[in-house]
C-alpha cells in the first residue's frame, strides 16, 4: 500500500504543510538469498544489469542475475572479513570494503577471482567506497578518516577528518568533480576536493541532526537522510541554504539509505518502520511504500538508470529488493 503526503520544514521559512494522500502502484519485489542468515548490507549494479551485494555477516560477495533469478556467492579470501560497501567500476570490476580486516577487495566478474589490498594502519574500519577516474575512494568510520587507493600503483593515502569522532560514512560523487561525505557522528556534511583530497566541513543548522547517507543531484544539490531526527534534508552549495522535510514515520523513523531515481525522485528508507519513501523534488510530495517482509532495513540502494530499477539490500531479512519504476 502506498500513501502520499508532504511536510516541509525550511531553515529559512519554518512552515509546515499537509497534502492529501494518493494511491500509487509501486511495490517492492523481494528475492530470497540462499542462506537463512544472510545479511546483505550494500548493493551495486553494473552496466549489464547484474546486481552485486555484500553479505556482511557471512563474508560473501553475492551476484544476482535479474533475468534468471540466479544467485551466485563468492567467499572473500579472508574469512570473517565483514564486507560492507560495494561499487562497480566503469571497467566492470567490483570493489568492496572489508570492514573487519582493514582491506579493500576487487572481484573480477569474468573469473570470480577476488584480490585483497591492505590499507594503512589509520584506515581501520573502512565503510563506503566509490570510484572516480579509476581511483577508489573510501570512508573509514572507526578511524575517523577517509582515503583513496590507486589500483595501478597500489598506493593508498588517508586523511583525518578535522572534527573528532565524526564517523565519516556515506560517500558520493558530485557533478563538479567533488566528493561528498556524511559525517554521521556530527551535524555536518563534508566536501572533499576530488583532486587534492582536502575536506571542508559544512554545519547543518540543527545541532541534533545526524546525516547518515547522502546523494547529489544533477544540479549539485546535496540530499541527506537525517537518521537521528527523522528528516530528509537538502543543502544548496551555491547559496548555503538548507531545507528539511519531516519523514512520514515521524521523528523516530530513522531515515537511512537514499538514492535518486531516473525520474528525479528521491527514494529513502525509514529504518524503523520498514517503509520506503519517494519524494518528488518539484511538488514536495512524499509517497510511502511498505516493504513486504517485516524487519527489513535498507542501509543502501543502487539505481539502474537504464532499466528504471532501484535495488535494495534488505538487511535483517536475507533478501534483496527491487522497485520497478516503469
Stretches with model-predicted labels:
Residues 51-57, 94-100, 137-142, 179-185, ...:
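Conserved beta-strand positions in repeat-built beta-propeller and related beta-rich domains
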Residues 297-326:
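Blade-level signature of beta-propeller repeat domains, shared across WD40, Kelch, NHL, RCC1
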Residues 2-13:
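Bacterial N-terminal signal peptides that target proteins for export
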Residues 65-69, 108-112, 150-154, 193-197, ...:
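Short loop/turn segments that connect beta-strands within beta-propeller blades
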Residues 23-37:
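A short helix->beta-strand "capping" segment at the edge of beta-propeller domains
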Amino acid at each position: 500500500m502506498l500513501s502520499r503526503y508532504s511536510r516541509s520544514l525550511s531553515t529559512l521559512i519554518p512552515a509546515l504543510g499537509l497534502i492529501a494522500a494518493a494511491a500509487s502502484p509501486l511495490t517492492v519485489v523481494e528475492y530470497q538469498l540462499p542462506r537463512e542468515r544472510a545479511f546483505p548490507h550494500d548493493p551495486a549494479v553494473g552496466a549489464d544489469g547484474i546486481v552485486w551485494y555484500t553479505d556482511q555477516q557471512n563474508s560473501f560477495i553475492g551476484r544476482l542475475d535479474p533475468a534468471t533469478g540466479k544467485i551466485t556467492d563468492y567467499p572473500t579470501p579472508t574469512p570473517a572479513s565483514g564486507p560492507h560497501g560495494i561499487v562497480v567500476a566503469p571497467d566492470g570490476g567490483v570493489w568492496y570494503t572489508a570492514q573487519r580486516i582493514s582491506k579493500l577487495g576487487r572481484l573480477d566478474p569474468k573469473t570470480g577471482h577476488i584480490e585483497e589490498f591492505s590499507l594503512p594502519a589509520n584506515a581501520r574500519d573502512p565503510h563506503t567506497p566509490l570510484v572516480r577516474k579509476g581511483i577508489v575512494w573510501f570512508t573509514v568510520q572507526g578511524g575517523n578518516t577517509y582515503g583513496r587507493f590507486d589500483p595501478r600503483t597500489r598506493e593508498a593515502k588517508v586523511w583525518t577528518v578535522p572534527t573528532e569522532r565524526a564517523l565519516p560514512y556515506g560517500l558520493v560523487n558530485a557533478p563538479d568533480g567533488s566528493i561528498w561525505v556524511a559525517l554521521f557522528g556530527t551535524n555536518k556534511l563534508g566536501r572533499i576536493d576530488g583532486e587534492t583530497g582536502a575536506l571542508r566541513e559544512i554545519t547543518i543548522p540543527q545541532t541534533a541532526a545526524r546525516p547518515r547517507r547522502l546523494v547529489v543531484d544533477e544540479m549539485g544539490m546535496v540530499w541527506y537522510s537525517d537518521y537521528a531526527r527523522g528528516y530528509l534534508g537538502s543543502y544548496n552549495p551555491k547559496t548555503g541554504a538548507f531545507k528539511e522535510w519531516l519523514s512520514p514515520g515521524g521523528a523516530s523513523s530513522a531515515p537511512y539509505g537514499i538514492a535518486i531515481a531516473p525520474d528525479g525522485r528521491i527514494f529513502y528508507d525509514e529504518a524503523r518502520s520498514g517503509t520506503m519513501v519517494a519524494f518528488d523534488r518539484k511538488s514536495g510530495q512524499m509517497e510511502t511504500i511498505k516493504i513486504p517482509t517485516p524487519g527489513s532495513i535498507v542501509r543502501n540502494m543502487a539505481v539502474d538508470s537504464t532499466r528504471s530499477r532501484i535495488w535494495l539490500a534488505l538487511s535483517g531479512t536475507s533478501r534483496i529488493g527491487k522497485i520497478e519504476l516503469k
